[in-house]
Amino acid sequence: MIRKNKAVMNRVTEVCKRLDEQYGPDMRTYLDHRNAFELLIATILSAQCTDSRVNMVTPSLFAKYPTVHDFAVADVKELEQAIHSIGFYHAKAKNIIGCAQKLESDFEGQVPRTLEELVSLPGVGRKTANVIRGNIFEDPSIVVDTHVKRISKRLGFTDSDDPVVIEQDLMKILPKDNWIRYNIQIIYLGRTICKAPNPKCEECFLKDICPSAK
């Protein structure tokens, strides 16, 4: 649990300012979608997989299964074949069908809004739920993925490895208006500059205020 003090808060303010200057304040998920259900399915598929790979699969997937009901009654083997280029496709196909069935039985075929309802769906954890809450419903939420975990620790915003604790730490110090876009901005920073091995600190626009800069 990180201590909230003046030094940390000053760093938070400057980091958020520079992220907005570098990437813009209107960033949203990289997963292509046209509605809440498509984003839900795409996010389930994105676990342990790149967004670009998911975006290659979803156009034909949603053409074959255009509605919640189509997924709910899908043959698992056929769905597996449709998503076989994505990792863990056996488990994901089962979860997607179960998710669609629960949406039909419990939520009238609509994607629910609350965290509690979202995580009750098969294949949906806090990360996926917060992607939906932020990008679809504009509910302030923080998505903790591998990039957010790594870079938030490097910036001194958290000292935990637990995604729930990291989420709580960030909620205490980040301005609420920044919660949704912080994740997307940090993902881009992590993919291009602040990589897991060999971060490019000399190229980073945060190097002068980052406690971990080399």
Regions found by a protein language model. Name each.
Residues 2-214:
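Catalytic cores of DNA base-excision repair glycosylases
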